[in-house]
Amino acid sequence: MQPFGKWQMPTVSHPMSTRPNPLAWDVPAPFTERVTVSVEHLDQFGHANNVQYLRWLEQVAWGHSISLGLGFDSYERLGAGCVARRHELDYLAATFAGDELMLGTWIQECDAKFTMWRAYQIVRAGDGKTVLRGRTQWVCVDLKSGRPKRMPPEFVGAYKPVTMLA
């Protein structure tokens, strides 16, 4: 048990479980991964390049999907996958080489038909500052034709929206 104010919270290992929230996440228990900004991530201004943030968002999105049992092997078996239709990103603060970042993601909306919105938040671990907020609209497509396809029941069951705010 870990102390949490006057209450005791159980220590759990599942990435989507409820636990004390030391960083200021927008939702109680996002799926998270940690990355460190390296010099390869920097642009001419000396901070992490905007394109690198998009790569990190893709990385944490796949990590989350895999944790839900939907890796690309599942997509192939089901003949369906999710592709990005729209990104909305707000860059709130710069990050630099050596900064440790926590990448957080969760499903914000899912119509259980063709589309879902995945939300993201990147928090700098050193000071707890949110450096990026964003979301991506994903569309379910047939892997052979590339045309929109109704979400298989496995997608509907796994990609459930988080409804409670932190």
Where are these regions (language model features)?
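HotDog/MaoC-like acyl-thioester-processing domains
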Residues: 4-33, 94-100, 108-166
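Catalytic strand-loop segment that frames the active site of acyl-thioester-processing enzymes
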Residues: 10-67
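Hydrophobic beta-strand-centered segment that forms part of the acyl-chain substrate-binding groove
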Residues: 64-116, 131
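Glycine-rich, flexible loop/turn motifs
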Residues: 38-44, 79, 137, 147, ...
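Short, electropositive, low-hydrophobicity segments enriched in small/polar residues
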Residues: 50, 73, 150
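Generic structural detector for well-ordered beta-strands
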Residues: 34-38, 88-90, 137
